[in-house]
Amino acid sequence: MIIPWQQIDPTTLYNLIESFVLREGTDYGLQEKSLQQKVADVLRQVQSGEAVLVWSELHESINIMPRGQYRPY
């Protein structure tokens, strides 16, 4: 289930995104980005609708994924 980011407390949203960034091993090319830059990039994607917050009832967890990859069960 997609969770609207606007309904999440801003501090909680930041913490969710930071946790996501820390567990993702994304390669940012030749120049590494700071944690704050990575969080800002993901936040921008969430706010623009490119990425969505998804609640998994099976795993009882929230994940962030590209909107195009989301498949409701």
Curated annotation (Swiss-Prot):
Q: Which domain of life is it from?
A: Bacteria
Q: Which Pfam families match?
A: UPF0270
What family is this? Belongs to the UPF0270 family.
Q: What is this protein called?
A: UPF0270 protein SG2298
Q: Which organism is it from?
A: Sodalis glossinidius (strain morsitans)
